[in-house]
């Protein structure tokens, strides 16, 4: 009985996704429930891979810079204007 309810719930989520709603966190742009699940998994895995390549410090520093960006200027421009130190040497990938 539980699997019938699960299937019904998935069908409802799929219908909503096909109508253009995002039903899976990170699944923005997917045209079906399965597509949104795949997008979310890929985005999560991509971020994890970058974190492993750059190391935790570099990944955190990159996030600081990205968080400073606005519609008018990049994070680097804003950091320079406001005198915020961003240590880009931490970005180097591990070899």
From Swiss-Prot:
<feature type="compositionally biased region" description="Polar residues">
    <location>
        <begin position="1"/>
        <end position="10"/>
    </location>
</feature>
<dbReference type="Pfam" id="PF00477">
    <property type="entry name" value="LEA_5"/>
</dbReference>
<feature type="compositionally biased region" description="Basic and acidic residues">
    <location>
        <begin position="40"/>
        <end position="64"/>
    </location>
</feature>
<dbReference type="InterPro" id="IPR038956">
    <property type="entry name" value="LEA_5"/>
</dbReference>
<protein>
    <recommendedName>
        <fullName>Embryonic abundant protein 1</fullName>
    </recommendedName>
</protein>
<dbReference type="InterPro" id="IPR022377">
    <property type="entry name" value="Sm_Hydphi_plant_seed_CS"/>
</dbReference>
<feature type="region of interest" description="Disordered">
    <location>
        <begin position="1"/>
        <end position="95"/>
    </location>
</feature>
<dbReference type="InterPro" id="IPR000389">
    <property type="entry name" value="Small_hydrophilic_seed_prot"/>
</dbReference>
<dbReference type="GO" id="GO:0009737">
    <property type="term" value="P:response to abscisic acid"/>
</dbReference>
<comment type="similarity">
    <text>Belongs to the small hydrophilic plant seed protein family.</text>
</comment>
<comment type="function">
    <text>Em protein may act as a cytoplasm protectant during desiccation.</text>
</comment>
<feature type="compositionally biased region" description="Basic and acidic residues">
    <location>
        <begin position="75"/>
        <end position="95"/>
    </location>
</feature>
């Amino acid at each position: 009985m539980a699997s019938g309810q699960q299937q019904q719930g998935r069908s409802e989520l799929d219908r909503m996704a096909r109508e253009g709603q995002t039903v899976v966190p990170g699944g923005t742009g997917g045209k079906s429930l399965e597509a949104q699940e795949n997008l979310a998994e890929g985005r999560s895995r991509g971020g994890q891979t970058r974190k492993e390549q750059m190391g935790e410090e570099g990944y955190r520093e990159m996030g600081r810079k990205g968080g400073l960006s606005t519609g008018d200027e990049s994070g680097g421009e804003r950091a320079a204007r406001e005198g915020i130190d961003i240590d880009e040497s931490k970005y180097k990938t591990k070899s």
